[in-house]
Amino acid sequence: MKQIYFGGGCFWGTQKYFDLIKGVQKTSVGYLNSNMKNPTYEQVCSGQTNAVEAVFVEYDENKVSLNELIDAFFKVIDPTIRNRQGNDIGTQYRTGVYWVDPQDEQLITQKFRELQANYPKPIVTENRAMENYFLAEEYHQDYLKKNPHGYCHIKFD
């Protein structure tokens, strides 16, 4: 199994979206690349942690490739806007692909170059190493499964 992290705005919808992709084995939501250990949701929202609301994705590369996951991801984000997705505004809502395997960095860089042709503005989605990841509070895990009519910037219909 391979691992990758995605920051795609509010992590509730991003998690549900990746859960629907064949080959994704497991997801969780948390706070990534924080300058504070074990931040709370309130601390992340305050901007003092510089953390990203992120989704951990464990996937079977025999069923879905990283390229395919990035293609799917770009269908539900605006990669040309920094620190905002939909109505969610703040540094925690910036977009990014955060790798564990250093070999993935080059693949992501190349994929971003290819995808840039589809956008008139520069892609500002981050391509960085996952430095740390703190699991978000339990009520955030699988939020839209527990609250099917909850707020989401991603349209599933």
From Swiss-Prot:
Task: Describe the family membership recorded for this protein in Swiss-Prot or TrEMBL.
Answer: Belongs to the MsrA Met sulfoxide reductase family.
Q: Which domain of life is it from?
A: Bacteria
Q: Where is the signal peptide?
A: none
Which class of enzymes does this protein belong to? oxidoreductase
Full protein name: Peptide methionine sulfoxide reductase MsrA
Gene behind this chain?
msrA
Residues of the active site are: 10
Q: Which reaction(s) does the protein catalyse, per the Swiss-Prot or TrEMBL entry? A: L-methionyl-[protein] + [thioredoxin]-disulfide + H2O = L-methionyl-(S)-S-oxide-[protein] + [thioredoxin]-dithiol; [thioredoxin]-disulfide + L-methionine + H2O = L-methionine (S)-S-oxide + [thioredoxin]-dithiol
Instruction: State one Pfam family annotation.
Output: PMSR
Name the coiled-coil region(s): none
Enzyme Commission designation: 1.8.4.11
Q: Name one GO molecular function term.
A: peptide-methionine (S)-S-oxide reductase activity
Deleted gene: phenotype: Non-essential, it can be deleted.
Q: What taxonomic classification does the UniProt entry list for its organism?
A: Bacteria, Bacillati, Mycoplasmatota, Mycoplasmoidales, Mycoplasmoidaceae
Cited HAMAP family: MsrA (MF_01401)
Which PANTHER family does this chain map to? Answer: MITOCHONDRIAL PEPTIDE METHIONINE SULFOXIDE REDUCTASE
Alphabetically sorted, this entry's keywords are: Oxidoreductase
UniProt keyword Cytoplasm, yes or no: no
Q: What does this protein do?
A: Has an important function as a repair enzyme for proteins that have been inactivated by oxidation. Catalyzes the reversible oxidation-reduction of methionine sulfoxide in proteins to methionine.
